[in-house]
Amino acid sequence: KNPEITIGIFSHVLSTSKKFVRQIQRALEDRRLYELFPDVLHEKPPQRFWSADAGLIVKRKGNPKEPTVQAAGLVDGQPIGAHYDLRVYDDIVTQESTSTPEQIEKTTSARKLSLALATAAGGRAWYAGTRYHPMDTYQTLIDRKALKPRVRICMDKDGQSVLMADDKLKKLRTEMGERTFAAQMLQQPVGEGMRTFQDDWFQTLEKLPAPEKLNRY
């Protein structure tokens, strides 16, 4: 809709964000898309500024220093002096980046630095990713009301699979294990060393025992 827009795609590391740019590149090279938007897309990809490394530039009137779409790493490869109308944070948190409190803080601090890469008007920011730890960078953003969470999981409210057949999801859960399944498929991370309550741990008492028989702490 706006060929003048500049977009920075941020992932935890640069190599991951380049994969997203390559996917966009293939889509923009589709002949059918060019026939719909010949005033924006190139009939033949240009030799310069049409790669995951250099970024992608569509036909535009302005001449900003930023490509139309550019890959960026959050903790490695953050651009210097670039300012984007839209920053897309996709997979800025990984399982490895939540292995220690120091790694979590490194990601959180890098995200703060990336805020300077917005335009003077502030720009927009989108976030998409998977939770791997209850105190990860995403939780910090939620606590600060820096974003509005929209959680999409593999089940509906009745516990029925919306992603694949129920038997396949059950098998996947068994093979993944509860901790990985909770993070990857339910967006409910459980930190290392932490335990969640299970229903069968609780007992229902119809009558309270005498106070002298209770342990007090």
Where are the regions that the model predicts?
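Walker A/P-loop NTP-binding motif
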Residues: 1-2
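A structural signal for short, well-ordered beta-strand segments and their strand-loop junctions
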Residues: 8-11, 70-71, 88, 126-129, ...
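Conserved nucleotide-state-sensing and coupling region of NTP-binding domains
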Residues: 9-75
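Flexible loop/turn segments at secondary-structure boundaries
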Residues: 16-17, 96, 133-137, 159, ...
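Alpha-helical scaffold elements adjacent to nucleotide-binding pockets in ATP/GTP-utilizing enzyme cores
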Residues: 19-27, 83, 106, 110-113, ...
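Conserved RecA-like ASCE ATPase "motif II neighborhood" in helicase/translocase motors
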Residues: 51-113
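ASCE P-loop NTPase helicase motor core
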Residues: 101-159
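ATPase catalytic-site recognition across NTP-hydrolyzing enzymes
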Residues: 159-217
